[in-house]
Amino acid sequence: RKASETTKEKFAPIREWEEKGLLTVIDGPTIDPKTVVGWFVEQREKYGITKIVADNFRMDLLRPLFLEEGFEIEVIRNPTAADNLLAPRIEDAFANNHIIFGDNPLMRWYTNNVLVKTNGDGNKSYKKKEEVRRKTDGFKAFEYCLWRADEIIDYDYDDAFDMLDEIEF
């Protein structure tokens, strides 16, 4: 092999992921806050999202728009502390195969871009392996969902189907 082949960094296949509908490429220096909120409104229709949990990044711009659309907002003020608090839940979920990304290479890419740092006290934080090309936004969104995962109602569909079976039409 040539030296350049072994050291060449692989770029994420962004266009391929866009064609699969896993992401949308925005032509501009930043994403318009209305576009972000509009995406969440669409997801609310599919998944019943009512609450947005996020760190402080851009929330000064996004908060009024989210509130206007009827979302509840919770801001994680110390993301590093949140990393440490959620680390056991995240580690357990991955270790016990409770996380299934399905056929979504984008989420695997986000997760594989994360570097777990453990300080001298044993506290863990989730950092980027490399600052420029290694995006972790999807992993952080996943992590922040776990911040309030205990608020999600676990519904027993078997009971509902049993009840429907008892109804005579």
Predicted regions and their residues:
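Short, surface-exposed amphipathic charged segments that create phosphate/polyanion-binding patches used
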Residues: 87-96
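RNase H-like, metal-dependent nuclease domains and their acidic two-metal-ion catalytic environment used
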Residues: 1-78, 84, 88, 101, ...
